[in-house]
């Protein structure tokens, strides 16, 4: 099975590090997807939601603020973000807390109202699916 190692890091530490099937990120020129053996690239990221498809088919989401960057190599992708919040948890209380933190992060860092509205809609959709 093809897999890609994804690492998401902030100044506070590592947010995510695992082998995944694919990842979709909010690039500076629009959203794009990354699969194993992707062409090498380095680019900046907008505020938004990173969607991760794990090896077992489950989906994780991480909200990031503006100004991050991504380095994609054939078998490893590294995302550096000023701020990031994992959206999820093992119970409704944890999910509600992470949802609120994600919304606050995106609201405080994005001056673009379209990016903000789109990101909040994606976050809300993920919570409804859990």
UniProtKB/Swiss-Prot annotation:
Please tell me where this protein is predominantly located: membrane
Q: Where in the cell is it found?
A: Cell inner membrane
- Is the keyword DNA-binding assigned to this protein? no
Keywords for this entry? ATP synthesis, Cell inner membrane, Cell membrane, CF(1), Hydrogen ion transport, Ion transport, Membrane, Transport
Record InterPro entries: ATP_synth_F1_dsu/esu (IPR001469), ATP_synth_F1_dsu/esu_N (IPR020546), ATPsynth_dsu/esu_N (IPR036771)
Disulfide linkages recorded for this protein, renumbered to the chain, are none
* Molecular function via GO: ATP binding; proton-transporting ATP synthase activity, rotational mechanism
Query: Which CDD domains would you find in this protein's record?
Result: F1-ATPase_delta
- What Gene Ontology terms describe where this protein resides (cellular component)? plasma membrane; proton-transporting ATP synthase complex
Q: Per UniProt, what is the membrane topology? A: Peripheral membrane protein
HAMAP family hit by this protein: ATP_synth_epsil_bac
The protein's job, in short, is: Produces ATP from ADP in the presence of a proton gradient across the membrane.
How does the record describe its quaternary structure?
Answer: F-type ATPases have 2 components, CF(1) - the catalytic core - and CF(0) - the membrane proton channel. CF(1) has five subunits: alpha(3), beta(3), gamma(1), delta(1), epsilon(1). CF(0) has three main subunits: a, b and c.
Family of the protein in this entry: Belongs to the ATPase epsilon chain family.
Q: What is this protein called?
A: ATP synthase epsilon chain
Name the encoding gene, please. Answer: atpC
């Amino acid at each position: 099975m093809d897999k890609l190692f994804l690492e998401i890091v902030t100044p506070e530490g590592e947010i995510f590090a695992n082998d995944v099937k694919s990842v979709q990120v909010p690039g500076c020129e629009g959203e794009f997807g990354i699969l194993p053996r992707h062409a090498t690239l380095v680019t900046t990221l907008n505020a938004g939601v990173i969607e991760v498809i794990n090896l077992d088919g489950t989906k994780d989401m991480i909200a990031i603020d503006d100004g991050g960057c991504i380095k994609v190599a054939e078998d490893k992708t590294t995302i550096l973000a000023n701020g990031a919040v994992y959206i999820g948890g093992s119970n409704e209380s944890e999910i509600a807390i992470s949802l609120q933190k994600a919304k606050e992060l995106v609201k405080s860092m994005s001056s673009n109202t379209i990016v903000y509205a789109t990101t909040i809609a994606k976050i809300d959709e993920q919570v409804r699916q859990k």
